From Swiss-Prot:
Belongs to the WD repeat WDR12/YTM1 family. SUPFAM superfamilies: WD40 repeat-like (SSF50978). This is Ribosome biogenesis protein WDR12 homolog. Gene3D superfamilies: YVTN repeat-like/Quinoprotein amine dehydrogenase.
Length: 419
């Protein structure tokens, strides 16, 4: 078999974890030059004999999506052609559909969705609350400089609580009366000496963490009443809140912060490092060195992997569990400018989204490093933040003064079920 020239046949086994799409587990002889299109035709022909309708599939060969000819994929992986090759096929994830464009008065630098609400933060110093159907509910003044990050603390039918951080060197705790549609600033959190670029609420909603241009990581109480011993009566009465913990270790701005669990924090920084912090010990548990400034980072509780967004147009994947944390597991190519923001899906183990200064959002599968699954178009200028906290909606904000809302598979399936 002249495999180097892409000729001849390859013995393959076709496998799927979706049992209703399973085909007979026997060796199939296929041409080495086949692509995803031909494999789709082949598998669908086998399924058609069972009475199934046509389905679009993607194909995984040695844990990576097939994006060209099978022979080229195997040659790149240095895989022998002598033995039967296992090919896994999965139903193709549907393309997210544009749903809404939410117009703001200035750059939208922070977005976070929860339930039927979307919280946004802008460069005009205001917060905004919207429904995920595109209705504007409230504009909230309070900060004195552009807002850089937001996160929900808790949300039910009657009350919403959230936190915002800003270039004005503060974070603010807010309480929203949903029925009356009124918002109160519960506390102004002071302690940083420069702008606060990142904020994240703990899984139990009792604390939140902030990362700043002053290189400090700070942890604060998210409770309505801060009963800490270090809080003076004067500060309580003025609504000022001070940090419970201050952690030093980064050399430049902390651009990303996320809770990995109840006592562990992940931070990413312009100093080219990721750090994992143990709050029970109040110190660094692990460090991952990279070769680029990190603009954003995202940790997945489903697969324990970390993604980073950087200035060199690429996204990178690291394993939080390995002792060789500086080794890049994968690099994802597709953006044409700085990648500003990245986030794992909270429900789909392999999927994540990114936003870039090339004006594009992209939906990825971490097993497809050479190309995204889909480009999510709509922004006319730089994408500044992206969020997939609500599994139904991918939400992004940009310097075109808009928030773009895309319906993901969960919302699309629900829409089909109600028709």
């Amino acid at each position: 078999m002249d495999v180097d020239n892409g000729e001849g046949q390859v013995q393959v086994h076709l496998k799927t974890k979706q049992e209703h799409y399973a085909v007979p587990d026997v060796p199939y002889a296929i041409d080495g030059t086949v692509t995803t299109a031909e494999l789709n035709t082949f598998v669908n022909a086998l399924l058609l004999s069972k009475g199934s309708s046509a389905v679009d599939f993607d194909f995984l060969v040695f844990d990576e999506y097939l994006r060209g000819r099978l022979c080229d994929h195997l040659r790149e992986k240095a895989i022998s052609f002598e033995d039967a090759i296992e090919i896994e096929y999965v139903e193709r994830f549907p393309a997210p559909e544009p749903q809404d464009c939410l117009l703001h008065d200035d750059w939208v630098s922070a977005v976070k969705a929860s339930g039927k609400w979307i919280l946004t933060g802008c460069y005009d110093n205001t917060l905004n609350i919207w429904t995920n159907k595109g209705k504007h509910i409230l504009t909230i003044p309070g900060h004195t400089a552009p807002i850089k990050a937001v996160d929900w603390i808790s949300l039910d039918d009657d009350t919403g609580r959230f936190v915002s951080s800003s270039q004005d060197q503060t974070a603010m705790l807010w309480q929203w009366n949903v029925g009356a549609n009124t918002v109160e600033c519960v506390s102004v959190c002071k302690g940083h000496e420069r702008g606060v670029d990142s904020v994240s609420v703990s899984p139990d909603g009792q604390r939140f963490a902030t990362g700043s241009w002053d290189t400090m990581l700070k942890v604060w109480s998210a409770e309505l009443e801060d009963a800490g011993e270090g809080t003076s009566k004067r500060m309580k009465e003025s609504g000022v809140r001070t940090p419970k913990i201050t952690l030093q270790g980064h050399r430049e701005s902390i651009s990303a912060v996320q809770w990995m669990d109840a006592s562990t924090l992940l931070t990413g920084s312009w100093d080219h490092t990721l750090k994992v912090w143990d709050l029970s010990l109040e110190g660094i548990k692990a460090e991952i060195s990279t070769n680029k400034s990190i603009f954003d980072a995202s940790y997945s509780k489903l697969n324990h992997l970390i993604l980073t967004a950087s200035a060199d147009k690429n996204l990178r994947l690291y394993d939080s569990r390995t002792n060789q944390g500086s080794v890049v597991r994968n690099t994802y190519l597709g953006h044409n400018a700085w990648v500003q923001t990245v986030m794992w899906s909270t429900t789909e183990e392999f999927l994540f989204v990114s936003g870039s200064y090339d004006n594009q959002n992209k939906l990825w599968d971490c097993r497809s490093p050479k190309a995204p699954l889909y480009d999510l178009l709509g922004h006319g200028e730089k994408v500044l933040d992206i969020d997939w906290s609500n599994p139904k909606y991918i939400v992004s904000g940009g310097s075109d003064n808009t928030v773009r809302v895309f319906k993901s598979r969960k919302a699309l399936v629900e829409n089909m079920d109600t028709k």
